[in-house]
Amino acid sequence: MELGNTIKEIRKKKKIPQEILAERSGITQAYLSLIENDKKEPNLSTLKEISKALDTPLPLIFFLSLSEEDVPDAKKLIFSQLNPSIKELVSNYL
């Protein structure tokens, strides 16, 4: 799961500077940088604040963060076929 990278991609797509997202989320810019670079894993309450500040539902952030390694073997084929299409549709939402 690439949660930090997903947060960074959404932030950049929405053209929100890192310092603004950090401020709106109630965390420091340094901590947000660590999250975005997958050096730290935020707790659920921090994720909720980041999600709110990004105006993006938390389940959507989790979904976009999934990689094939996160999916059970029995479901990898369908995930690999559906995931790119769903991500493309979702990117239009963001």
Regions found by a protein language model. Give the residues of each.
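Short basic helix-loop element that most often maps to the first helix and adjoining turn
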Residues: 5-24, 76, 83-84
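Recognition helix of helix-turn-helix/homeodomain-like DNA-binding domains
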Residues: 26-41
